[in-house]
């Protein structure tokens, strides 16, 4: 977009947020190079303290606000020399306590031209003003220094080409040291300022004249690519050769230059030798992931080694029989084995899919443990902790066990995903049970196990076939491979009525099979064939039919793999919002590309233990309060999460989004009465078995699948890529730390013919999705320089072959009715079949 400038006088500041310097102001226009025709314009952006009635020039892009019309989104600004009257008004404003109009006039009279610079240079002249006390004088100078310094720094940062948001993040991190630090060490931003990546830091460094082959540039790119690869792929390490390749691509594309790969390899060697990153043989680790994996091994080993008095098997068996009698159930052999092993082990792993009785076994473990130790489960001070990765999973645990449960973050006192700290003492418990452990990443697992005492018994529960954690690692899957850890896998399905087929479907898909009756209508599930272009028309009809049958709109959840596209989360959220909560007059708040309305269904995106709201929690907007009525002077959204009221001002709205449709990842740990699952070939590489399996197992009563049979077929046969982790080897002690920490040695070893990639990739079926899945062919025997001069071979794979009548083709889809011969009565019949 083109940048325009607007020069003029600030009429008034409409809104300001002191925490991030975001301001909205009204500018009376004197001059502009745009074709904007009005005499005043709204200007928004990050800026320091500005003065009403003073002249400024703002540069930025013209944007169209749905409510306020065309406005300028500022990227940088300059203040003209302030007038005497403007300074008097500024000094006498609420910014400065104890300064009235007469005192302000006297200050301007004493200091003359450019008074702000002169005041900061020589504040002693203020002593000439008799009615200005020493306290007010010092407060005035201190506040002026902050305001003026902030403006100067933010303005200077903007002049370097930094976005207002980036400038604000940098200033919040370094305050008055911001300019000195970034001018001397711009690449430090990559490591220390959240949200500032390599490209932003590199643009700044280029403006400061730092060469494209400067060592600090190469090091910053290596560190950035190392962590980026882990976050994107879920790996805890990356092979040296792959890291070098990724880094050189970034370095060369950022400045359109060619680099000598040997220079980058040298800097990687230096990083390893300086312990800025870690290596095991040819594997390169981000420091936090290396030590987190090592910590998991260390702490679990510590816990296992301490063997306090464990009840004998016959004593456990006797207590278990009493529990069976109390509950009126009989555990089968595998379930009994699981309960006995769990109570005899310091660390035990229980796995199983839906309907296999995990909750029944957990309740058996808890009640038998209580009987063995003489505990009254009705008391509040039990030495038992129940934990889960998400708030919804923790609440489900509480509902199923009737015991207190909380998120892992709450138990550890962590307030967000990025909050890393060590507890001063161990968790106060003798038994801890952690559910939904497949969602726990390497960092969180390390913090959890570090906080568990030697004498505590640990029971890990999860479904190994669900999606792995969003963060790096596959801790549950890796721990299941450790021979020394006792474990039981539940496979027999118990929770299924005669008419229930969802659990059976999930079990078949888990085994990589699309059952022969997949497209048949069942009492609890249905499938509708649809091209991606038809999904937006079909979903509202399905939801409407569900509501007409008596199902609450809150009980219907759309799950999708992707955010973009016609069948994506963003589009479906907009469609469903207009269907279920249409706009009434102007009662909505715009935020980025979203409109928030009263009664909207919303999803919380981060953990906040102070507010008792967590990542994945679903709530309702209860009220929208305009800024002119709030203490914060910002628009505020009032929300309820299961009765817990939360209020967010505008600067915190990035913590929430609409929840009519949500990602399958975000749905983990939750169950919904009705799940609508649109799956088409648009989702491409994301279509993997564990993704579909996770989505299907979220449905408690009804499951509606719609999309393309080819996409479902591909997904269930595609196991996806296995993550690169090193946790198993740490337990097996089958590795040696590289003594010679040199990349030259690493590359030489690889060049002898061994493969440089350890990631096990299973591309699923031999025929993959059309135009979606690509492979990169790298010859590991080439030397490093030649590797990067070779073109990447991208070959398009063939589509899944399915029976032609199962899917729409490019030739015929546009000629078919959007409902594809399906009547609304057909949909209604499914929901009315109770």
Language model segments and positions:
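Short glycine-/polar-rich loops that comprise or flank the Walker A/P-loop
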Residues: 53, 58, 382, 429, ...
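Conserved nucleotide-binding/hydrolysis modules and their immediate coupling elements
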Residues: 6-14, 18-63, 327, 577, ...
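Pre-Walker A segment
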Residues: 279-353, 369
């Amino acid at each position: 977009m083109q940048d325009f400038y607007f020069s003029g006088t600030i009429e008034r500041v409409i809104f300001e947020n002191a925490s991030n310097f975001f301001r909205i102001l009204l500018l009376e226009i004197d001059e502009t190079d745009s074709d904007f025709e009005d005499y005043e314009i709204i200007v928004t952006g990050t800026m320091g303290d500005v003065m009403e009635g003073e002249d400024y020039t703002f540069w930025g892009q013209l944007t169209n606000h749905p409510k306020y019309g065309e406005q300028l989104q500022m990227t940088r600004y300059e203040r003209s020399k302030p007038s005497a009257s403007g300074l008097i008004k500024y000094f006498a404003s609420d910014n400065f306590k104890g300064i009235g109009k007469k005192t302000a006039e006297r200050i301007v009279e004493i200091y003359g031209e450019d008074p702000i610079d002169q005041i900061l240079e020589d504040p002693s002249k203020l002593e000439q003003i008799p009615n200005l006390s020493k306290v007010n004088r010092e407060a005035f100078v201190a506040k002026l220094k902050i305001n003026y310094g902030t403006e100067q720094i933010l303005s200077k940062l903007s002049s370097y080409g930094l976005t207002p948001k980036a400038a604000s993040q940098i200033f919040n991190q370094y305050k008055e040291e911001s300019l000195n630090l970034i001018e001397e060490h711009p690449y430090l931003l990559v490591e220390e300022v959240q949200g500032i990546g390599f490209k932003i830091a590199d643009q700044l460094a280029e403006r400061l004249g730092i060469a494209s082959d400067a060592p600090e540039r190469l090091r910053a790119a290596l560190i950035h690519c190392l962590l980026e690869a882990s976050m994107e792929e879920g790996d805890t390490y990356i092979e040296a050769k792959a890291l070098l390749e990724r880094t050189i691509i970034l370095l060369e594309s950022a400045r359109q230059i060619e680099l000598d790969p040997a220079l980058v390899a040298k800097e990687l060697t230096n990083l390893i030798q300086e312990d800025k990153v870690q290596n095991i043989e040819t594997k390169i680790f981000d420091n936090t992931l290396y030590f987190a994996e090592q910590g998991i091994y260390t702490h679990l080993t510590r816990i296992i080694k301490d063997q306090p008095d464990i009840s004998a098997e016959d004593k456990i068996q006797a207590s278990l029989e009493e529990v069976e009698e109390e509950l009126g159930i009989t555990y089968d052999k595998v379930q009994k084995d699981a309960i006995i092993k769990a109570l005899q082990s310091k660390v035990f792993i229980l796995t199983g899919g839906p309907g296999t009785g995990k909750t029944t076994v957990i309740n058996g473990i808890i009640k038998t443990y209580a009987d063995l130790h003489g505990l009254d489960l009705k008391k509040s001070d039990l030495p038992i902790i129940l934990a889960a990765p998400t708030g919804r999973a923790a609440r489900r645990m509480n509902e199923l066990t009737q015991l207190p449960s909380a998120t892992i973050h709450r138990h550890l006192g962590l307030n967000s995903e990025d909050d890393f700290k060590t507890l001063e003492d161990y968790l106060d418990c003798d038994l801890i049970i952690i559910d939904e452990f497949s969602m726990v990443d390497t960092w969180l697992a390390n913090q959890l196990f570090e906080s568990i005492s030697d004498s505590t018994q640990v029971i890990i529960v999860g479904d190994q076939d669900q999606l792995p954690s969003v963060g790096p690692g596959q801790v549950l899957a890796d721990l299941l491979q450790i021979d020394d850890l006792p474990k039981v896998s539940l496979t027999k399905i118990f929770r299924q009525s005669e008419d229930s087929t969802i659990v059976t479907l999930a079990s078949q898909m888990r085994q990589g099979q699309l059952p022969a009756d997949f497209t048949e209508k069942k009492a609890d599930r249905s499938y509708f064939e649809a091209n991606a272009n038809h999904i937006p028309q079909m979903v509202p009809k399905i939801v409407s039919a569900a509501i007409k049958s008596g199902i609450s709109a809150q009980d219907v959840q759309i799950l999708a793999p992707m955010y973009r596209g016609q069948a994506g989360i963003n589009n479906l959220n907009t469609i469903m919002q207009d269907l279920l909560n249409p706009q009434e007059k102007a009662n909505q708040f715009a935020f980025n590309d979203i409109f928030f309305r009263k009664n909207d269904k919303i999803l919380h995106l981060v953990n906040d233990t102070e507010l008792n709201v967590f990542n994945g929690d679903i709530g309702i907007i209860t009220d929208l309060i305009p800024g002119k009525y709030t203490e914060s002077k910002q628009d505020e959204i009032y929300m309820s999460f299961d009765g817990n009221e939360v209020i967010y001002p505008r600067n915190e709205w990035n913590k929430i989004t609409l929840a009519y449709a949500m990602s399958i990842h975000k749905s983990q740990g939750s169950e919904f009465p009705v799940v609508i699952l649109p799956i088409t070939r648009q989702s491409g590489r994301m279509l993997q078995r564990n993704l579909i399996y996770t989505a299907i197992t979220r449905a408690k009563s009804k499951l509606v699948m719609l999309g393309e049979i080819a996409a479902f077929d591909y997904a269930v046969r595609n196991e996806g890529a296995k993550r690169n982790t090193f946790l198993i080897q740490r337990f097996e002690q089958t590795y040696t730390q590289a003594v010679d920490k040199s990349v030259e040695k690493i590359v030489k070893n690889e060049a002898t013919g061994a493969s440089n990639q350890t990631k096990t990739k299973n591309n699923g079926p031999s025929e993959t999705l059309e135009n979606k899945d690509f492979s990169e062919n790298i010859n590991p025997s080439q030397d490093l320089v030649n590797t990067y001069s070779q073109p990447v071979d991208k070959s398009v794979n063939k589509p899944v072959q399915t029976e032609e009548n199962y899917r729409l083709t490019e030739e015929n889809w546009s000629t078919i009715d959007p409902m594809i011969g399906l009547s609304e009565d057909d949909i209604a019949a499914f929901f009315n079949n109770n």
